[in-house]
Amino acid sequence: ARRERARLRLGDGESGDLMALLDREGLKVYRPQFPEGTPLEGIFLFDAEAGPILVVDGRLTPLEADFVFARLYAHYLVDNDPYVIHLLVRGAEASAQDLRAQSFAAAFLVPAEGLAAYFEALKWVPGTALDAPTALQLAAYFEVGYRTLLARLLTLNLVQPDEIPPLLIVLEAGGEPDAGGRERNAISERFLRLALEAHARKFLDDRALA
């Protein structure tokens, strides 16, 4: 995750809109609304003509979608097998590949170096109980959901498992962190621009554009 962040020149702070980032990398990314009530959150597959495709449920909040996109990106980087389709299903037992993807996603979205710098600025000492206001600041700074943040802190031994449930109750009672202007677009801005340009040049009619 650290090497990939360095390659993308993301620094030690927030990663920004993952859908837009992966789109700039040339990946096919989509956020259609999945059927209501489905536990399916994301799909990674490889198409012979289109290449790697990452699909995330458009019903997820933007920050939840970022975490799913990051997990799918991990499968793209490590498990890019044209004969395997990866389904991210909420509540399903995680395979070794899924656990690795979750760890990558948390590390990619919340870099250890950025955390260390932030804690140093706060003069927070590891081993001290993390309070809700500090967790709220961290989630806002890295632009991640509370569960993503706490999962990352847990892997770095900065919080203990028994600290997480009461923190989540307080944090989630106040609503999701700010999404940094992310929108719930079903297709990427790049594909939208291409479609509009094709329509303007008469390569697509009104029905095809719709």
How should each PLM-predicted stretch be described?
Residues A1-A210:
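Active-site hotspot residues in diverse enzymes, especially metal/ion-binding acidic/histidine motifs
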